Amino acid sequence: ADLWVLTQGEVDHTSLLSPPLSAADLQDQQRTVTSRAAENLFWLGRYTERAEFVVGVAWLALETLRSASPPVRQWLGEVTERHGLVPEGTPTPTQSLRVFERALALGLPAAAGVTSVGFNLRALVTCAQSLRERLSPDHWRLIQELDDHFEQHMASALAQSAREGGAAPVADVVGVLGRTSTHLSAVTGAQTDRMVRDDGWRLLSVGRQIERLDTLCHALARGLEAGLANSDEGFDLLLGLFDSMITYRARFQGRREMLPLLDLLVFDTDSTRSVAWVVRTLRDRLRKLARHDGAWAYEVTDPLPMPETWSIEQMAALDASGRPAELIAALHRTVDAVRELSSAISNHLFAHVAGADRSVWQ
């Protein structure tokens, strides 16, 4: 029941309720990002990008190996081995294509190990689960379904292979990888358009760009060293890896030349897969992210290259072996620089530096 108190004196209007927010309160409001959340966001970005890359590489390998030339087979074998998609000691595609295909297919589910496609998808789910308050319901559901559908359909494909005598179920696995790639595109779309672009989102983006720069620069450098750009199939493979096939055909119809290829994959600042775009985006977002610690942000990003200042004529110049040696060296230096940057971010910002619940930005 209500209780009314009568008094003859002045009434005290003090209230324990929070006062309404003022315009000044809203203007100064910053969302806190704890060290634990910061690390999870960073790795959510990295696992998303890593999953996209290994799914794409596995798909390209299984789709093209049987008709590929020896240089292309060798490059695909090196890239898949570097990313742990086949066990160490597996015969290369040039040594035994059948054994390599089977090892690649069997190494895709989560149970195969910490570098498998399935493990990366499971790690993506684990990071997302710790960030439920930052993800829309659709975003979270997409990530859950991605992992569940991949494991279910991959297990079905491999079980069918076992019943039929153990041959690599290439067509079935390629189909599963294609659907997984489409599902991952929906996840990255949710990250781009369904998240608030605060400091936490910028850290997620930084993680994605670090992973993208590392994987694409190394793959391109090894592809150029293997002479992939000198053949039609290798040319298409590089464009497919950078998801730039349609863009290249629209701009340079009927041309298969080194200069326009490098212009699109390395120097184009409008293509989200080009080296120049990724480096610039990584640098700008990290500096904006760490604006409260500007000296550190500039110190760790200054060693990153600036591809927009490179000379395309100089970088595309071929040496005696027909390879763009200067560009290859620059790509390897970029890989080294981005790995050092990743270590610097981890050492400076994340929970193992101090208390797990400390604020990184506020």
Residue ranges and their predicted role:
Residues 1-362:
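Alpha-helical transmembrane segments and their helix-helix packing motifs
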